[in-house]
Amino acid sequence: MEILEFKLGGNSFGIPVDMVREIIPYQATTPVPNSNPSVEGIFMPRDVIITAIDLSVYLNRDKTAEEGLFVITNYRNLDVAFHVEEALGILRPEENEIASLDNTLGVDEAHIAKGVIRHDDRLTILLDFDKIIAQIQPDLLSKEEMEALLQ
């Protein structure tokens, strides 16, 4: 398993590399009226409209500065960019190196984290991006899919 490690609000988080389509420099976005507060806006880097999500806002932290990177994923044929501060590198943990969650995580992260990777004297929280996208854009899933994902 390969994990893209990135920094957000001074903490280290991860996303499976197989979910990442590309990483691009931050670009200004156009706000979307009446959208989820985590939706930073939309932008169009190559004639494709992409929804930008500010992970800091989603995790109840301060808004990410208008700099950094977009980690672009494709979820159910919807391009989604996650605004992060910086990419730190690729981790290659073994399955047994990903610890299950316990009470050390805050409530906001515990329900959307797949586990914690310990390496180089720091912890990287492996986020569940399927759950994050489903919570922000619930209309992408059927009722049954949403219930199964949130269990």
Q: Residue ranges of each PLM-predicted region?
A:
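An acidic, low-aromatic, low-complexity terminal/linker signal
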Residues: 1-151
